A protein has these predicted regions:
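A solvent-exposed, charged loop/short amphipathic helix patch at secondary-structure junctions
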Residues: 129-146
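Short amphipathic alpha-helical face segments that pack within enzyme cores
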Residues: 66, 70, 155-163
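A short beta-strand motif that forms part of the nucleic acid-binding face
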Residues: 123-126, 200
């Protein structure tokens, strides 16, 4: 009996079950892919078959899933607070931008006049990623930096925040395809707190960082740019890596892309 094989087969079954969550949304973008390469997104909505993850990657992803499940259970079993609604693994949709996804945690407090929204997304990090983000050199770079930038994780949770805003504050927001949406977002920024909970897989350290609400505008700009690029029919399949802005978004993407074998351009 090979226990590694048994476990890997189990993870494969779980992955197939998870696909059921997105059945019917095959041609939608995933909120978790915010900030990704435009061509990778194009492959996804056109249902090109991706290279499967290797066994090691599946195990790493499973560790993150287990920690997520623990957090959800802890929040679910916590003492309820007055006037607070708790959303866990909540589906968010923004049809105007062709986005669907699942937000980890959202707390909604309504006092009868105002709605306050607290959003958090849990991210598990390996040692190198944790040190890169929170180590001494990272702190020094942060102090010396004067430019606000948002990475993949920040854009992801900001995308979920946009979906929640659309769902619970629809009367305050314009259509997401209009230029007025940026103005409308500015009017409700005091209602929302966007956060990432970081969990070290190496030593179980945890940190929570609040993300600037500027990330809402950055996420909106990314998704509008992606939709515009794809709708313009730029013969995307023929564009090689670095052949256009957004292909890829970051240099490291190609090394881990599940479509790298077919992404050669012409």
């Amino acid at each position: 009996m090979n226990l590694e094989t048994i476990y890997d087969d189990y993870l494969e079954r779980l992955q197939e079950e998870r696909k059921e969550l997105y059945k019917g949304y095959e041609k939608w973008f995933s909120g978790s892919s915010a900030g990704s390469c435009y061509k990778k997104q194009w492959y996804k909505i056109n249902e090109f078959e991706a290279e499967p993850f290797d066994a090691r990657t599946k195990r790493l992803l499973r560790l993150g899933t287990i920690v997520h499940a623990d957090f959800e259970k802890a929040i679910h079993e916590a003492e309820p607070q007055d006037n607070v609604k708790v959303l866990l693994e909540h589906e968010v949709k923004i049809p105007e931008l062709n986005i669907v996804g699942h937000l980890d945690h959202c707390l909604l407090r309504n006092d009868g006049k105002n709605t306050e929204i607290y959003i958090s997304d849990l991210k598990t990090l390996a040692q190198y990623s944790w040190t890169s983000k929170f180590g001494r050199n990272a702190k020094k770079a942060s102090i010396n930096s004067v430019q606000q930038s948002f990475g993949h994780y920040e854009l992801q949770v900001a995308t979920y925040a946009l979906g929640i805003l659309k769902e619970v504050m629809a009367d305050d927001l314009a259509d997401f395809n209009t230029s007025k949406i940026n103005f409308d977002i500015e009017q409700i920024l005091h209602n929302i707190s966007i956060n990432i909970i970081w969990y070290s897989k190496n030593d179980s350290k945890m940190k929570t960082t609040e993300i600037s609400t500027d990330a809402l505008h950055a996420a909106l700009a990314y998704w509008n740019g992606l939709n515009d690029f794809i709708n313009e029919d730029n013969l995307i399949e023929t564009i090689p890596p670095n052949g256009a802005i957004g292909i890829p978004m970051q240099d490291w993407e190609c090394r881990y892309c599940q479509h790298s074998k077919i992404c050669k351009g012409s």
